[in-house]
Amino acid sequence: MPAEVHGSPPASLCPCPSVKFRPGLPAMALLTALDDTLPEEAQGPGRRMILLSTPSQSDALRACFERNLYPGIATKEQLAQGIDIPEPRVQIWFQNERSCQLRQHRRQSRPWPGRRDPQKGRRKRTAITGSQTALLLRAFEKDRFPGIPAREELARETGLPESRIQLWFQNRRARHWGQSGRAPTQASIRCNAAPIG
């Protein structure tokens, strides 16, 4: 069992300075499934030990979680060292806590603070008319990779921004590639060609 932590760890080890450690509490307790209290499939030498954190460790984890739902590896390592829990277990704790929070927010129909609002900051979809599509398709048949001057000319003809023309060609190439199957490469053409002479 790890050593007991008495008092507060040095401030340099704990990224959450507001967390206070209670003196005399063991840093962590590990339980193993050696008796018949767990189902058979949960027992055995390959199973991970269950981590039971002390109240002070839980306080430290919660304080850091409230400050940042997605802490970086350095923060998790400092926290793990400060409360004497292995870093992978700290990472799993954060994943589990985010999952619980997300479930609670879904039940209460509140927006999840860890994700941006899908409608906020999203570009409005550009509507392309049939005549604009026909013009772009003709240009695509002539040249699937038009340069800037050609795209600017298409922008003038269609009234669409050049950046939208560029994206339309990228999307069309991706769709065309998927529908037509893989085009043969130059190397495969050379390898499959009949020998000369």
Swiss-Prot record:
Protein name per Swiss-Prot or TrEMBL: Putative double homeobox protein 3
Main subcellular location of this protein, as a coarse class: nucleus
A Gene Ontology cellular-component term: nucleus
One annotated GO biological process: regulation of transcription by RNA polymerase II
Family of this protein: Belongs to the paired homeobox family.
SUPFAM superfamilies: Homeodomain-like
Superkingdom of the organism of origin: Eukaryota
Annotated CDD domains: homeodomain
The entry's keywords: DNA-binding, Homeobox, Nucleus, Repeat
Gene Ontology MF, one: RNA polymerase II transcription regulatory region sequence-specific DNA binding
Other known facts: DUX genes are present in 3.3-kilobase elements, a tandem repeat family scattered in the genome found on the short arms of all acrocentric chromosomes as well as on several other chromosomes. May be functional despite lack of introns and of a poly(A) addition signal.
DNA-binding region(s) in UniProt: 46-105, 121-180
TM annotation in the entry: none
Tissue note: Expressed in hepatoma Hep3B cells.
Sequence segments annotated as region (Disordered): 102-127
Organism, scientific name: Homo sapiens
This protein's encoding gene: DUX3
Subcellular location: Nucleus
Coiled-coil region: none
